[in-house]
Structures are given as structure tokens and as C-alpha cells.
UniProtKB/Swiss-Prot annotation:
The keyword Metal-binding is assigned to this record: yes
Gene transcribed to yield this protein: Cpd
All copies of domain Peptidase M14, residue ranges: 62-380, 502-792, 930-1209
Stretches of the chain found on the membrane's Cytoplasmic side: 1319-1378
Regions that span the bilayer: 1298-1318
Source organism of the structure: Rattus norvegicus
GO biological process, one term: cellular response to interleukin-2
Cofactor: record remark: Binds 2 Zn(2+) ions per subunit.
UniProt name for this protein: Carboxypeptidase D
Cofactor needs: Zn(2+)
Signal peptide stretch: 1-37
Keywords for this protein: Carboxypeptidase, Cell membrane, Glycoprotein, Hydrolase, Lipoprotein, Membrane, Metal-binding, Metalloprotease, Nucleus, Palmitate, Phosphoprotein, Protease, Repeat, Signal, Transmembrane, Transmembrane helix, Zinc
Binding sites annotated in the UniProt record for Zn(2+) 1: H139, E142, H257
Modified residues (Phosphotyrosine): Y265
Domain text: There are 3 carboxypeptidase-like domains. Only the first two domains seem to have kept a catalytic activity.
Length: 1378
């Protein structure tokens, strides 16, 4: 519409001669201008009110089909000033139509040049500005939303241009995104005038579904789904929307539909999936009701609650709103996905009874919804907003968690640390948490009606780890000073009792735990074992005077509560216990001594999902007992008598991984429903209720009594008289199976599979007592809880040591005569064995050592310390090998001070928190923000070499099919000089081009090492003593074809010829890439270790990928793989949780390649077989090609593991092979454990990685005698061995002396025989001299003579017939004729 400013004035210049004098003219002009301005203002106001925007008059008389939609959005954007709007597409529909989005917010600036495409065209995010999205036309035949969002776009843009105060304020403070049509294909199939009242056409022709017949609002991942997750390949529209949501931090959203007139809010479905009538409440139910009412109350029809839609005339909605599932159950809906998986609060808005009304009704529909739409957008500013920042640098912390006490729904901060938490008026306690920072809680934040309350969080960095440890101890600073009070000293001090007695739902429990971890950092460490089915953290609070560290000789104890979600007393008691221990440490002697001498782990809730479903006051029901997959966790552990066929649950897997990672000695599993301590076994082979005695039955009775006797009601043995009249437990304890049979129980698994003794404690007859009764439960159990923990210090404890070097022996076995239950040592050789008082015969044994047996008397007060020193069984064999022969010497010491210093460093880095300390001391972390194309990768590597020429060397191993270089970067202090005595490690990635995360991680590793060289002493020493080879991209051609954010596509998986390179490593490799790797990398046979990075899951595989019956050196290969997994924050838990296989369970995160994906021709198989180098494959992420925004997190997850490989390559066995003169022998063959072969390098050096333990070594070299020895490999240091060869004097496999003697005797015998024959011949010759002799006539005499003469001469027979010695012609002739 014209504004009037460009109209030509009605008067002409020629008429100036008719004008009045100047003063009067000026007055007339002023009057005319005022009138004209008033006219314009009136016209604009009329347009806004009636037309809804400055649109052409014809905009309400038709629908926007095909390209017209994009043109209409372009026109809407043009209605505003420059820099206000960006039009972009988030993807395409099945039929290739763009999914247009118009972004409207002030300050966007001009669009980029050249123009960006796709999501990149959206423009930059703006700090502190909340994002709102409105999505229309999800069902193609529900069309009103498609139109009103275009009208809304014009209204906002033109209103901002004309200076409407409300709209200017809105777009100056809000980031608005309008997506008019999510299903453009369906819209084109739909028919105007079809109100959806009946099935008026063939199936699939209504336009509701997409072109593949999929309902988009049933195709999102669902928290209550009962079947397989939807395949996003069938719904590219949903895939595009999910990707868009993940790339942003939307705060508020509306999903616009048709077919009724009502505002619907989450949840849209329930676990029961009842068709209708189930109110499925979210944790933010009040907020959602508030948002829905805000829309409905401004809609003239919706606010009545009586839409009177044809066919549903009687349907009513109070206040015009409804809970989605209460109306009808919708599984796979978009609004629930936004709330559960993103920061976004979304409601669904049904705009009209008729789904596709005639275009003549569009103006009225716009007028009905205009105010509601604008009001809903404004509601993004309610609640609390602010920033979470680093207190040191002031930078914003992305993905920090914001939790509200009492509301079980967290949100996370955006890219700039900004957050917007929607809340209704009230008072709230907010907590901000970010990994690596101390949590911070701000209490009593008042939210009022209107604009959000502004609160900023400034978090202090911390070195506290949130990952369970599994390694040995090192000393750490920061321990708290406590008075040195003897344990038995009486004190007038009364312990401080807990005051926090109420039921803690998950958000409250989370805040409670974080508060105590924050207030008592010197004795606490809060960490998580993983997540429940519904992604709640499985928290554990560690309490120790040295948190995060296993102190050799100190036992570890655990309590686990709330395994059954509706049995809640244990959960609350453990929270009380945390408060009690923290507040009394340093002042109460008993607590102080217990914390100083014990590492305590308290897990308040193993089943947080079940707890949230349980109801206060429950005594006997099973609601909430099971986890969210409806499995009883105490029937889910492997059992000795009964095969457990149920799938192992995430909570079970997490606990099993945890228990195997720590040297737990004693444990209790806290339950409810009775009042008794129950001890193993819990079941028996017959499956009937009868006593099932374990080998340690006496020990279990003793520790069970230690708890029950401190609880007077339990000790009486007659619990729950009102419920179970005949139930009686003498002294409050019982054998589990004697009570009732429980296959798959946790306590039996602890005892049978680990060193841990566990009992199950039933804490009360009421499973979920009322809150007012909680103080009574604490008072009844507090002494029992403390006394039971003290039992960890009963029996025998000590160390098993190596007699040669005094080191502790890992996994040595302690056996007690007549008790068939051995325990094993931890990393420092420390052990604990619970026993009742008495005299025992205890034997310590270890592979490669001679066992030692001692008689031990156990007292009733405290554990007795007994150390065992074992002698290596290989000593005698080595001494035998030295007698007159070559020999081998195993030693762990060196006289070189620098070598000793480096060995000490490796031991330190192998110890607990060693790598964490190293990483904290290194330079500030890297900024990974994008992927490197082949060109960028090449330039990056050249840049490293230019900047660090003294420690880097860049070479090409060959070229790909499309002639791209396969780069190899060596990092070493002498990169161009051979140093055979140094171990050599290679890192390779990108064998599958569609999985480039590994490539980026290796580039980050290279940059990290270069940046820290000569700045960080650890990096400097590792680079100086290691030859590090990095090959970041084995398949550069495939990488160029792959697409970012494509998590499942195989595009780029193969090389340019379509060959999977990981199937081409054979003796007749056909591809140039594999030939280059084989010839220039693997066949050099000088690497000690290889790490290959891939994608598609989160685990480590070890050889072989081909199906084989046995795996040589399996123990070592699995050890290397486990080392990587254990240093990864989640990999070791064995739950990749990949969308395509969410139930996958990988024990320890490690698996043999053939057991995961069996195939022939793999790189790691070839490396082991022909390169004699162990290789493991690390799968770094479920998504093959995640967005670049995830790279920093992936680097953080894998950094420690990658660095641990640089440490590990310096362990195993270092050897030198030489002869007696000291000359090194190269190319000698070293055979380990009769299987693995390596060759000595130049200078006689060899290095091989081996799992900790005793290993056999055979050395073979041409010309030398074979040598045999044994070597003991430590977990934290290399073992050195020197093999001295003696010259091999054997001939035909026999000793030289024997061969010479026999040969001499044989020659003597031959000479003697020849002499005898000569003498005999001479005598006979003399008898026939001087005459003729008669020839023999008789044949037998002739034969006798032949036999005699043939033994001494090989002359012809005729020469012996004539004996005359004359020499006449006649005689000669005569002889010749006979």
C-alpha cells in the first residue's frame, strides 16, 4: 500500500505566479503537511487493524502453492528494514520441496557474500536473545497454519519498519523463526474445502502424511515408545527438523495444526498408551498450562472451550486447553520430543475446525489468531534468564546444566553461556553445573509476572574428576587438617545429626549431592556411573580423606540404595549419612577415623526412574519397583544356578562395571518391605526356599549381625507383625534362599564375581513411608550404618610383593584352606580378606611365582596385617641357562639417571590422576570448531612442519585413486634420524572417509604435542623418547565425498573405486591406498603399537576381525583395548547407546573385532600378522559424521585415552640382543609365549608390549644357540631384558665335539682297514712270484676268492687271475682275452 510520501503534489511549478506572498505560503504549507501526516497515520492504523499487515489486498483470497510460498516469504522479509530477516531452508521434503524458514530479529546484518545455503544461511546466533519457533502445516491437509505464519511474518516485518512499539520491542529482544510448511508435499495433494470430516478419498490422498505415507507427528523418538525407533530415512522432513533443533537452543515453540480449536500441551502420550483419559503430566505442567492459556485466552473461539466442531459438537475443553495424552494418546509427537530431548517448551495449537477451509475464510482465521500468536512469542521472556560464565576468564560456558529445585527437568546453556528458564511466578532455587567447575546454587530467586528475572552464574574451575577411577594412588594436595584423636578416645563432643528429613525427588537429590560436594571438597567427590533408562545420572558420592584416589592398603566400601524404586528408605538414609559424615569429619573421633581409614562410596539411588513413578505411603505395591523398561534390577544380574534371559539393563551394566573397577571389600544393598539382614546365597540349584550356604557363611553371619544388633527392632526378629504374622528371623538375620529364592540377585553376583562381600538389608515394613516418619528411620539405623562400615576392617589385610624388586603384584591370589573362595590383589599388591576370629592357613600365589603359605591367627579387634613376598619361579631356569652357555638377564633398573627419571615419569603417569594432572598442566586446550577438507588438512600439516621443523617431518606414503596424498607426520626430537632404541607408535584414521572424527582428533593430538613441546616437561620427555607417526586420513577421496551431520550415510565409506579399504589388506592388495600403507608403514615392522580411529559406535575392538578359533596374545591385545576404554569417560561402561542399537551391551567397552563385525582383509589383522604390531580400533562416536560443534566434546572424551597410549608404548619389554663379545645382533627372532614374533632392529634392540604378568621369551638367531627366559611385566613400568647369545657350534644338530670325535674315529678305522688289506695282498703276491700258476678250475673256489678279494679292492676280477709278475706281450695278451 502506498504511504503517500511518493505521491506528486497537485499543484504545478508554473502556477507559482498565482501563489500568495511568502509568509502566507509558509503557513499554508505547514497546515497541509500536518493534514497529510494525519491522513497517513490513520491509513496505516486502519491497515494494521483490519488487514493485519501491509499486504496487498489480494493476499487473503488464495493459498500459496509451490514456489509462491517462497516468494511470499521473500516479500514478507522485504517488508521490513535491511538486516531484520533471513530466509533459508532447513532441508527438503521427500519430493525435493524446500522447507522454508524465515528468521526475524533485529541486528542480523546483511546476508553473507557469496550467499550461504541451507542452515548456514540462517545467520549468526545473538547472545542472550531467546529463540522461538512456530511450525505449521505438519499435516499437509491442515493448511490454516501455513497461511497465518506468512501473514505473521509480514505483520512483524512491516510493524518493525513502521515503528510499532510492541513489535519493535519484540524483535529487538527475541529471535523468531517461522516455518510455514513442514509437509509441502502433503499440502500439494490436499484439496481446498476438505475439512477432514470423512474419508472422502483413497488412502494416502488426503495430504495428511508425507509422500511416503508417514505421519510426521508420529515419527519422532518417543520416551514411552514400545517398539523400534522410527526410521528417519522415511521422513526426511523430521530428520531436517531434528537436526535444526539440535543446532539451536530454542526456548519456546508452537506446533500449529487444524481439526479442532484448542491448545494442547505435553505429554502427548503415556507409558500405558491408553487411547484417551490419561493425564500425562510433565515436571513443568504449570508452565505448560500457563503458555497454553496465554494463547487460548486471546483467541475468540478457543477461550470459550467450546469449539463446536462438526462431528464433535459436544467436545469441550476447560479454558480452551488440554493435556495431550488426556485428549488422545499420540506416540512419536513433536512437542514431547522438544521437551524431552531439547531445551524447548512446545505446545500444539489447533487453529480451526475445518482442516482446509476455503480461501475466503483466511482473513477471519488470521484475525482470530493474530493476537494469540504475538502473545505466545512474548511469553518466551517469562521466568529466569542470565549467563553462566567462567569466573577466571569471564567467558560463557556452553552446555552448562541449569536445574531448578523441585522440578525434574534441566536445561542447558547456549553457545555464549546464556540461558532462559521458563517459569511461572514464584520463588525458586537454581543450580548451575558444568564439568570441570564447582556447582553453584542461588536460592530464593523471585519470579514475577512479566519480564524474566536476570541471574548470572560465575563458576569456579576445579580439578575434581567426575569419572570413576580405576588406577593406583598418587598423593594430591588439598587434604583437610584434622585433629589427631585416637579412635577409642571418649569425647564430650556430640555428633551433629542430619536435619534434612524429606523425600528427595531426583532434582532435589541432585542439588543435595552437589551442595555437599561443593561445601566439603576436601573429603568428597561426586561422580556418575552412567545414566538410567530415562537418562537420569546414577550418582555416587565418595567420602574419603583423599577423594578420587585409591590409597594402597586402604579398603573400599559401598552402600547402594533404592534398587527397587518404590523402596525409598535406603535412599534417604544414605543422604542422611552423607550429611552426617561430612558435618562430623574432623570433630567426631569415630567419623574422622572411619573416613581416614576407609574409602566410602555411597549410591543413594540405583533406580531413579522407578522412584519418580512411586507413591508416598506405599507398603505392598510394586508401582515403581522396576526400572523404566519394567525389569526388576535385583533379578537382572548373572546367576550361578539359573540363566538370566532378560536383557541386561543400563543400571545393571553401570553397577557391574563400577564394582569391577574398584577394589570393594564390603557392601550392603538397602531395600524395604521387611526388617532383616539377608546374606548369600540368594538362590539354589533346585529353586526352592531352603538354606543355601556360601563358603563364607560364618563371615556373612558375623557382618549381618553387626548391623542387626544395633537396630533393636530388627534384632528382635519379628518384623511386620501386622503384615506377616508367622515371619521370624532369629537375631534379625537370614540366609537369602532360606527366606525365598531370588535368582539374578546383586549380592550373590558381588560375592562370586568380585572380591566384595555384600548383604541385603531390609529397612522397614513400609516401602515408601510418609515424610514425617523419616527421622525415626534415621534414629533406628544410624548406629547400624556406622558399625556395618567398620566391618571392612576385620580379618586379614596386607600386600603381596615381588621378592626381586619389592613391587606389589597385581592379581595375585589369596586362598584360605578349607574355604573355597579366593580373593585377588589390587594394583599395589594390596588385599583384604574378611574372616571371623580363628587360625587359618593362607596361601599367596601368582602366575610365574612360587606360592607362599602362612599360618595366620585372626583376632576379633581389627584386621591383622600379613604380607607375602613371592620369588619368581623363572630364577632357577635362568641360572641353568647360564652354565657354559649364553644367557638372558631380566632387570628393571638402569644406571642412566635420565632413564631413571623417565621411568619415574611413566610410573607417575600410570598412577591415579597422573594423566589428569598432566592434562591440567598443559597449555590451554585447543579450539576445534570445524572439519578439515583435504586441502585444509594438507595446509594444516605443512603449517605444523613450518612452525615446528625440529620435531616434525611430513612425508607422503603414496597417493589415492584420485591422486590425493596420504600424509604421514612424524613427531620426534630427531624426526629424520633412526633411533631403534626408542619405541615407535602410529596413530591412523580415516580408513572410512565418512567417519572423519578420528582425523580431527589426530590433528588435535599433533597440535597439542607441538604446542606443548619445550613448554610442558611431560610432553617434552614423551616426544624426546618416542617416535610418533600420525596418518590422519587413509581414504582422502572418500572423505571429500562425505557430508557433515550425516550420521548413518555410507557416502564416502569406500574409496573412489567403491572398495572398502578395510577389506583390502591382503597379500595381493588391489587399491593404491592399501598398497601405500602396507609397503611404507606396516611392512617396515618397526612399530610397537598402532591405534586406528573409526566411527559408528563407542567401543574398542582388538584383533582379529576375521573369524578364528584362537587369538594369539589375546591377553595383551585385550589389555591394550581396555586401557583406552578405561581412560574414556563413558566407553568403559559398555553402553554406546547408539540410536540404531540402543540396547547394545559391550562389556567393558571392549570386544574382539570378529565378535562385533566379522570381515576379512582388515588393517589390524594385517598389522598383527605381517607387521608384528598390535593394533586396536577405536570407534569414537555413534554418528559417523557429527556436526563440528561436537568436536570439542569428542576431543575432551578421547584426549586422555590417546595420551595413555603414548604412555603405554613405553611399557612391556625392552630388550637388547648381543653376543658374548658385546656385538649387537640384528634381525634375531624374538618369540613370545610361543606365538608372537618380533625382530630385533639395528643395534640389536627390540620392544614388545605385553599384558602385566609373567611371559616366556625365546630368542633365535642364525649361528647362535637359542635362548629361553621368562620376564615379569609390570602395569606401570617397562621390564628390560638383555639376551646374550653363544655361538652355535653344532654340526647337523649335534655338538661340535661329538661330531669331531666320531669323525676322527671313523677316519682312523678306515685307514687301519686299508693297511690290513694292503698287507694281505702283499703276502699273497709274494707266494706267486717267478712263474706261472694254475688257474682254479672249480667254480666254488672261484666264488670264494671273489668274495674275499672284493672286501679290499675295487679292481676288476681279471687283474687277480694271473699272478706272474713278468711283463711280456704274450702274458699281456693272454690276460686281455680272458
Amino acid at each position: 500500500m502506498a504511504s503517500g510520501w511518493d505521491e506528486r503534489p497537485p499543484w504545478r511549478l508554473e502556477s507559482l505566479r498565482l501563489l500568495p506572498p511568502p509568509p502566507l505560503l509558509l503557513l499554508l504549507l505547514l497546515l497541509r503537511s500536518s493534514a497529510q501526516a494525519a491522513h497517513i497515520k490513520k491509513a496505516e492504523a486502519t491497515t494494521t487493524t483490519v488487514g493485519g499487515s501491509e499486504a496487498a489486498e489480494g493476499q487473503f483470497d488464495h493459498y500459496y502453492h509451490e514456489a509462491a510460498l517462497g516468494e511470499a516469504l521473500e516479500a514478507a522479509a522485504a517488508a521490513g528494514p535491511p538486516g531484520l530477516a533471513r530466509l533459508f531452508s532447513i532441508g527438503n521434503s521427500v519430493e525435493g520441496r524446500p522447507l522454508w524458514v524465515l528468521r526475524l530479529t533485529a541486528g542480523l546484518g546483511p546476508p553473507p557474500t557469496p550467499a550461504a545455503v541451507g542452515l548456514d544461511a540462517a545467520g549468526p546466533l545473538l547472545p542472550g536473545r531467546p529463540q522461538v519457533k512456530l511450525v505449521g502445516n505438519m499435516h499437509g491437509d491442515e493448511t490454516v497454519s501455513r497461511q497465518v505464519l506468512v501473514y505473521l511474518a509480514r505483520e512483524l516485518a512491516s510493524g518493525y519498519r513502521r515503528g510499532d512499539p510492541r513489535l519493535v520491542r519484540l524483535l529487538n529482544t527475541t529471535d523468531v523463526y517461522l516455518l510455514p510448511s513442514l509437509n509441502p508435499d502433503g499440502f500439494e495433494r490436499a484439496r481446498e474445502g476438505d475439512c477432514g470430516l470423512g474419508d472422502s478419498g483413497p488412502p494416502g490422498t488426503s495430504g495428511r502424511d508425507n509422500s511416503r505415507g508417514r505421519d510426521l507427528n508420529r515419527s519422532f523418538p518417543d520416551q514411552f515408545s514400545t517398539g523400534e525407533p522410527p526410521s528417519l530415512d522415511e521422513v526426511p522432513e523430521v530428520r531436517a527438523l531434528i537436526d535444526w533443533i539440535r543446532r539451536n537452543k530454542f526456548v519456546l515453540s508452537g506446533n500449529l495444526h487444524g481439526g479442532s480449536v484448542v491448545a494442547s500441551y505435553p505429554f502427548d502420550d503415556s507409558p500405558e498408551h491408553k487411547t484417551t483419559g490419561i493425564y500425562s503430566k510433565t515436571s513443568d505442567d504449570e508452565v505448560f498450562r500457563y503458555l497454553a492459556k496465554a494463547y487460548a485466552s486471546n483467541h475468540p473461539i478457543m477461550r470459550t472451550g467450546e469449539p463446536h466442531c462438526p462431528g464433535d459438537e459436544e467436545e469441550t475443553f476447560k479454558d480452551g486447553i488440554t493435556n495431550g495424552a488426556h485428549w488422545y494418546d499420540v506416540e512419536g509427537g513433536m512437542q514431547d520430543y522438544n521437551y524431552v530431548w531439547a531445551n524447548c517448551f512446545e505446545i500444539t495449537l489447533e487453529l480451526s475446525c475445518c482442516k482446509y477451509p476455503p480461501a475466503s475464510q483466511l482473513r477471519q482465521e488470521w484475525e482470530n489468531n493474530r493476537e494469540s500468536l504475538i502473545t505466545l512469542i512474548e511469553k518466551v521472556h517469562i521466568g529466569i534468564k542470565g549467563f553462566v560464565k567462567d569466573s577466571v576468564t569471564g567467558s560463557g560456558l556452553e552446555n552448562a546444566t541449569i536445574s531448578v529445585a523441585g522440578i525434574n527437568h534441566n536445561i542447558t546453556t547456549g553457545r555464549f553461556g546464556d540461558f532462559h528458564r521458563l517459569l511461572i511466578p514464584g520463588s525458586y532455587n537454581l543450580t548451575a553445573v558444568s564439568p570441570g567447575y564447582m556447582p553453584l546454587t542461588i536460592n530464593n530467586i523471585v519470579v514475577k509476572e512479566g519480564p524474566a528475572t536476570e541471574i548470572d552464574f560465575s563458576l569456579q574451575p576445579t580439578v575434581m574428576s567426575v569419572v570413576p577411577d580405576s588406577t593406583e594412588a598418587v598423593t594430591t594436595p588439598g587434604t583437610v587438617a584434622v585433629p589427631n584423636i585416637p579412635p577409642g578416645t571418649p569425647s564430650s563432643h556430640q555428633p551433629i545429626q542430619p536435619k534434612d528429613f524429606h523425600h528427595h525427588h531426583f532434582p532435589d537429590m541432585e542439588i543435595f549431592l552437589r551442595r555437599f560436594a561443593n561445601e566439603y571438597p576436601n573429603i568428597t567427590r561426586l561422580y556418575s556411573l552412567g545414566k538410567s533408562v530415562e537418562s537420569r545420572e546414577l550418582y555416587v558420592m565418595e567420602i574419603s580423606d583423599n577423594p578420587g584416589v585409591h590409597e594402597p592398603g586402604e579398603p573400599e566400601f559401598k552402600y547402594i540404595g533404592n534398587m527397587h524404586g518404590n523402596e525409598v528408605v535406603g535412599r534417604e538414609l544414605l543422604l542422611n549419612l552423607i550429611e552426617y559424615l561430612c558435618k562430623n569429619f574432623g570433630t567426631d573421633p569415630e567419623v574422622t577415623d572411619l573416613v581416614r581409614s576407609t574409602r566410602i562410596h555411597l549410591m543413594p539411588s540405583m533406580n531413579p526412574d522407578g522412584y519418580e513413578k512411586s507413591q508416598e505411603g506405599d507398603s505392598i505395591s510394586v508401582v515403581g519397583r522396576n526400572n523404566s523398561n519394567n525389569f526388576d534390577l535385583n533379578r537382572n544380574f548373572p546367576d550361578q544356578f539359573v540363566p538370566i534371559t532378560d536383557p541386561t539393563q543400563p543400571e545393571t551394566i553401570a553397577v557391574m562395571s563400577w564394582v569391577k573397577a574398584y577394589p570393594f571389600v564390603l557392601s550392603a544393598n538397602l531395600h524395604g518391605g521387611s526388617l532383616v539382614v539377608n546374606y548369600p546365597y540368594d538362590d539354589n540349584e533346585q529353586g526352592v526356599a531352603t538354606y543355601s550356604k556360601s563358603p563364607d557363611d560364618a563371615v556373612f553371619q558375623q557382618i549381618a549381625l553387626s548391623y542387626s544388633k544395633e537396630n533393636s527392632q530388627m534384632f528382635q526378629g519379628r518384623p511386620c507383625k501386622d503384615m506377616y504374622l508367622n515371619e521370624y528371623f532369629p537375631h534379625g538375620i537370614t540366609n537369602g534362599a532360606s527366606w525365598y529364592n531370588v535368582p539374578g540377585g546383586m549380592q550373590d553376583w558381588n560375592y562370586l564375581q568380585t572380591n566384595c562381600f555384600e548383604v541385603t538389608i531390609e529397612l522397614g515394613c513400609v516401602k515408601y513411608p510418609f515424610e514425617k516418619e523419616l527421622p525415626k528411620y534415621w534414629e533406628q539405623n544410624r548406629r547400624s550404618l556406622i558399625q556395618f562400615m567398620k566391618q571392612v576392617h576385620q580379618g586379614v589385610k596386607g600386600f603381596v610383593l615381588d621378592a626381586t624388586d619389592g613391587r606389589g603384584i597385581l592379581n595375585a591370589t589369596l586362598s584360605v584352606a578349607e574355604i573355597n573362595h579366593p580373593v585377588t590383589t589390587y594394583k599395589a599388591g594390596d588385599y583384604w580378606r574378611l574372616l571371623v576370629p580363628g587360625t587359618y592357613k593362607i596361601t599367596a600365589s601368582a602366575r610365574g611365582y612360587n606360592p607362599v603359605t602362612k599360618n595366620v591367627t585372626v583376632r576379633s579387634e581389627g584386621a591383622i596385617q600379613v604380607n607375602f613376598t613371592l620369588v619368581r619361579s623363572s630364577t632357577d631356569a635362568n641360572n641353568e641357562s647360564k652354565k657354559g652357555k649364553g644367557h638372558s638377564t631380566s632387570t628393571d633398573d638402569t644406571s642412566d639417571p635420565t632413564s631413571k627419571e623417565f621411568e619415574a615419569l611413566i610410573k607417575h603417569l600410570s598412577a591415579e590422576n597422573g594423566l589428569e594432572g598432566f592434562m591440567l598442566s598443559s597449555s590451554s586446550d585447543l579450539a576445534l570448531y570445524r572439519y578439515h577438507s583435504y586441502k585444509d588438512l594438507s595446509e594444516f600439516l605443512r603449517g605444523l612442519v613450518m612452525n615446528y621443523p625440529h620435531i616434525t617431518n611430513l612425508t607422503t606414503l603414496g597417493q589415492s585413486v584420485e591422486y590425493r596424498h596420504i600424509w604421514s607426520l612424524e613427531i620426534s626430537n630427531k624426526p629424520n634420524i633412526s633411533e631403534p632404541e626408542e619405541p615407535k607408535i602410529r596413530f591412523v584414521a580415516g580408513i572410512h572417509g565418512n567417519a572423519p572424527v578420528g582425523t580431527e582428533l589426530l590433528l588435535a593430538l599433533a597440535e597439542f604435542l607441538c604446542l606443548n613441546y619445550k613448554k610442558n616437561p611431560v610432553v617434552t620427555q614423551l616426544v624426546d623418547r618416542t617416535r610418533i607417526v600420525i596418518v590422519p586420513s587413509l581414504n582422502p577421496d572418500g572423505r571429500e565425498r562425505a557430508q557433515e551431520k550425516d550420521c548413518t550415510s555410507k557416502t564416502g565409506h569406500t574409496n573412489a573405486r567403491g572398495r572398502d579399504l578395510d577389506t583390502d589388506f591382503t597379500s595381493n592388495a588391489s587399491q593404491p591406498e592399501t598398497k601405500a600403507i602396507i609397503e611404507n608403514l606396516i611392512q617396515k615392522q618397526d612399530f610397537s603399537l598402532s591405534i586406528a580411529l573409526d566411527g559408528g559406535s563407542v567401543l574398542v575392538t582388538y584383533p582379529y576381525d576375521k573369524p578364528v578359533q584362537t587369538v594369539e596374545n589375546k591377553e595383551t591385545l585385550k589389555h591394550l583395548a581396555s586401557l583406552y576404554a578405561n581412560n574414556h569417560p563413558s566407553m568403559h561402561m559398555g553402553q554406546p547407546s547408539c540410536p540404531n542399537n540402543s540396547d547394545e551391551n559391550i562389556p567393558g567397552g571392549v570386544m574382539r573385532g570378529a565378535e562385533w563385525h566379522s570381515h576379512l582383509g582388515s588393517m589390524k589383522d594385517y598389522s598383527v600378522t605381517y607387521g608384528h604390531c598390535p593394533e586396536i580400533t577405536v570407534y569414537t562416536s555413534c554418528c559417523y559424521f557429527p556436526s563440528a560443534a561436537q568436536l570439542p566434546a569428542l576431543w575432551a572424551e578421547n584426549k586422555k585415552s590417546l595420551l595413555s597410549m603414548l604412555v603405554e608404548v613405553h611399557k612391556g619389554v625392552h630388550g637388547l640382543v648381543k653376543d658374548k663379545t658385546g656385538k649387537p645382533i640384528s634381525k634375531a627372532v624374538i618369540v613370545l609365549n610361543e606365538g608372537i614374533r618380533v625382530h630385533t632392529k639395528e643395534g640389536g634392540y627390540f620392544h614388545v608390549l605385553l599384558a602385566p604378568g609373567v611371559h616366556n621369551i625365546n630368542a633365535i638367531a642364525d649361528g647362535y644357540q637359542q635362548q629361553h627366559s621368562q620376564v615379569f611385566v609390570h602395569h606401570d613400568a617397562a621390564s628390560s631384558v638383555v639376551i646374550v647369545f653363544d655361538t652355535d657350534n653344532r654340526i647337523f644338530g649335534l655338538p661340535r665335539e661329538l661330531v669331531v670325535t666320531v669323525s676322527g674315529a671313523t677316519m682312523s678305522a678306515l685307514i687301519l682297514t686299508a693297511c690290513i688289506i694292503w698287507c694281505i695282498c702283499s703276502i699273497k703276491s709274494n707266494r706267486h712270484k717267478d712263474g706261472f700258476h694254475r688257474l682254479r678250475q672249480h667254480h666254488d673256489e672261484y666264488e670264494d676268492e671273489i668274495r674275499m678279494m672284493s672286501t679290499g679292492s675295487k679292481k676288476s676280477l681279471l687283474s687277480h687271475e694271473f699272478q706272474d709278475e713278468t711283463d711280456t706281450e704274450e702274458e699281456t695278451l693272454y690276460s686281455s682275452k680272458h
